[in-house]
């Protein structure tokens, strides 16, 4: 099962966060990082990172920029908005060239071993349908906005139609912040 989280890294005193789908397996985590992303570049050389289990809206925010309220455990950044953060040491990096409908890309398959967990006192909010739709828009946005990913026109049209459909539902059922984040992504893609 893929779990949607926010991964945080630090390199040259700069914090980075990215929404990433990860696989949890006992005390280990596995993630696939695409060449060209800041997280990929950071974890080529950095050996520590955190996986932040956060509200869905924080996953969408993470696709837009790195600004956030960071806390630190042994200089490893994690998010103040997390329900909990898990800290990992990289134990393996594998590199593969992958070709799919998004084109050719270099992929780092990274495995980390858990070294610490911190639970924060953030109380979960009730789930809203806009939460899941906003995460889906963020996933599609991350692909459409990445200049390293080549998408054929038919797939691109389908993705844009999906974003518009999800946005129409968010406008009906979501809160102000859901709508604002979705609007930013649509504007960045010149869809508004």
Curated annotation (Swiss-Prot):
To M.thermoautotrophicum MTH863. Gene3D superfamilies: Electron Transport, Fmn-binding Protein, Chain A, Hypothetical membrane protein ta0354_69_121. This is Uncharacterized protein MJ1453. SUPFAM superfamilies: FMN-binding split barrel (SSF50475). It comes from Methanocaldococcus jannaschii (strain ATCC 43067 / DSM 2661 / JAL-1 / JCM 10045 / NBRC 100440) (Methanococcus jannaschii).
